[in-house]
Amino acid sequence: MHPKIGIIICGFNENRQFVPNVYIQSVRYAKGIPLLIPLVRSDRMIDDYVSLCDGFLFCGGEDITPLLFGEEPQNGNGKTDITVDLFQIRLMKRVLASRKPVLAICRGMQILNVSCGGTIWQ
């Protein structure tokens, strides 16, 4: 049976949520079944996704809102989206509690870090 890998959305705007195709192709190449996880607000739905998947891929994207790791935004910071940040942090905490495998790339590593109480140098 092929593992189901939850790929968390990397980009979001008012009309669409998306994941770069390279992540989907990579999971397929590794004989996994890619399942895209959209931004959801329900804790119950987050728990359902965590139960459904065998592993998770948190991919790259925009900067994390500095307020979420105890700092004020500085001039020159990139674009942030606190709604996406809060969703991904909630999801990461539940994934870690489930002890299922996580691959975190770029922003995904920052989400992992902040979810565990870490900070980021801006």
Can you annotate each of these PLM segments?
Residues 1-105, 113-115, 121:
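N-terminal beta1-alpha1 cap of cysteine-dependent amidohydrolase-like domains
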Residues 109:
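Catalytic nucleophile loop
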